[in-house]
């Protein structure tokens, strides 16, 4: 405990020195770019403050984390943030985007670049019948999150779109046939290679959102 207190004290001294140096105006910014954070809830809010636009989530997330596991907490806080942002600003796409990033940040301990640069865009598109569905565009840095977090991100998107009343993705016949063809062409190094029909029935046809990129 005394060692932790010493670390906190010395870190604060370093920040005090940095503030004095920044105040001279010789750098590009007069503020310290790396904010201090004490736990996951604090890190998440500070990491995504540009997307949250003043929405406070630290205390709420901390309480959720005390009562549930991190995976469940990521879904709960993502849905909560999306609903609050949509209620406050009225921008559905932006609310979903922010909720997704918050959920992904919780999954990755808010120490990776994935919540910032791994999600390229969130779009609300239309099925052939005119109904809406959610599309998530992923970028290269999402790989830093790992496979489980990437899959969870799609699940979080599905939970958010349900809460906000967005319909599910309905693939066309041509899209299904394309997946069946490409699955056979690109499957490499799998321990189990299901036939195209099985692969489609368990993934593409039951996927309520689309992931691009």
Regions from the language model: what does each represent?
Residues 1-205, 211-213:
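Extended, Lys/Arg-rich, non-catalytic nucleic-acid recognition/anchoring regions
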């Amino acid at each position: 405990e005394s060692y932790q207190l010493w670390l906190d004290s010395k870190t604060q001294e370093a920040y005090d020195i940095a503030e004095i140096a920044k105040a001279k105006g010789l750098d590009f910014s007069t503020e310290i770019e790396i904010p201090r954070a004490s736990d996951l809830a604090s890190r998440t809010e500070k990491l995504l403050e540009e997307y949250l636009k003043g929405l406070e989530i630290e205390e709420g997330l901390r309480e959720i984390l005390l009562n549930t596991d991190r995976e469940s907490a990521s879904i709960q806080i993502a849905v909560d943030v999306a609903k609050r942002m949509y209620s406050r600003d009225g921008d559905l796409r932006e609310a979903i985007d922010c909720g997704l990033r918050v959920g992904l940040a919780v999954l990755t301990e808010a120490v990776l670049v994935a919540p910032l640069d791994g999600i390229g865009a969130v779009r609300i598109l239309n099925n052939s019948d005119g109904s809406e569905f959610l599309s998530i565009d992923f970028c290269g840095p999402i790989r830093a999150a790992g496979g489980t977090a990437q899959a969870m991100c799609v699940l979080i998107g599905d939970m958010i779109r349900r809460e906000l009343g967005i319909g599910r993705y309905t693939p066309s016949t041509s899209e299904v046939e394309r997946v069946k063809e490409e699955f056979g062409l690109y499957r490499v190094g799998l321990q189990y290679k299901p036939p195209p029909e099985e692969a489609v029935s368990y993934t593409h046809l039951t996927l309520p959102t689309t992931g691009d990129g």
